[in-house]
Amino acid sequence: MREQIEGSRAVAHTVARCRPEVICAYPISPQTHIVEELSRLVKTGELAPCEFVNVESEYAAMSVGIGASATGARTYTATASQGLLYMTEALYNASGLGLPIVMTVANRAIGAPINIWNDHGDSMSQRDSGWIQLYAEDNQEAVDLHVQAFRLAEELSLPVMVCMDGFVLTHAVEPIDVPEAGPVDAFLPPYEPRQVLDPDEPVSIGAMVGPEVFTEVRYLAHARQMRALELIPEVAAEFSAAFGRTAGGLVRPYRCEDAETIVVALGSVLGTIKDVVDELRDAGTRIGVLGVTSFRPFPLEEVRAALGHAARVVVLERALAVGIGGIVAANVRMALSGIHLHGYTVIAGLGGRAITKASLHRLFADAIADELEPLTFLDLDRALVERELHRGRTERRPGPSAENMMRDLGPTATGIG
């Protein structure tokens, strides 16, 4: 049913209609409204049978999720930022044990320095943890990806992260078609676990594995992800047929057919990029954008097919691999191995910095003129950086860089001026 609703609440109601049996979570902004609404639904009996487990930390949340899933319960949790990092050890256990947990990641920057706003640094840090990672462009897709995520997780015996931009999506109130229970039930059958701890049929899971088998175990994890490359578009097509709208899949090209310049991005920034692409197209510029929905597994063949004819590719990403640069860009380069074109990595929107149409127009103009550096930081205040570098060279104890630069900016740094 289409209604005016906050993104977080829409996700919560959609998760409820997927009929989880155990929800375990610890609140952290900007994920909090999701789990608050789910706890309310459990308390009022609107979501039943379901146990909501209040835990003392994010590590505990994932640990409880592992136990619940291992005993055959459909399991859900949500987190963000430092909470996701706190879960890291347990995340690897969940995927290594083949447990189909679904988790919402309300993407938020990671510290230090502390920052509560949006970028993709949190989920990108877990790209090799064995979880499927799906990135939503808007709140409608965030809702729809959760329905698909439970189906994917349970068919593949793999956990799935649905990543949605914190605050930009989680706290946005807009018209969203929240799926009704009946169609969700038809699309998502009752959970039948492939492995379960059962006292009547005792087994152990997570046993120690020696060198003679460990490589094969890891290969199977990779093989399941490769199977996901086939299943993700199949499930997306079934969803489209059942619900009458498109969501999910591996990648989504927009005006790429004859494009000389193609931008690659994930998440909510795609909407702004599409607006700029339309404006440039109206002016005669052959440009397009490729939205990546599935970052893990990464769709090498589909990315290569979409980008291989372009003269240049601009990868715009909201996370930074310190010491090398782009994360998404490294995967795109692998997809384009052997193809000669101009490639640019652009780090943008870190810590919630706005990515404006004006900035994108300037960026794309420089890219089309092949005047970009291979690694570019969008709207970087170079004077501010140079002052801090000079301070570090000339003072024995210059103080914390973040605080120094905030002082240099003055009242505008805190939004006072």
Regions found by a protein language model. Give the residues of each.
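Short helix-loop-beta junction
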Residues: 39-44, 234, 238, 275-289, ...
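Thiamine diphosphate
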Residues: 1-125, 130, 147, 392-406
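Glycine/aspartate-rich loop-and-adjacent alpha/beta segment that forms the canonical ThDP
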Residues: 86-87, 159, 165-195, 386-417
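Peripheral docking tails and interdomain loops at the edges
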Residues: 317-417
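Conformationally flexible catalytic loops at phosphate/diphosphate-handling active centers
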Residues: 46, 50, 160-252
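Glycine-/acidic-rich phosphate or pyrophosphate-binding loops and their flanking alpha/beta elements
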Residues: 6-11, 238-261, 274
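Redox- and metal-dependent alpha/beta enzyme cores, enriched for Fe-S-associated oxidoreductases
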Residues: 253-285, 298-305
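Conserved thiamine diphosphate
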Residues: 117-166, 341-353
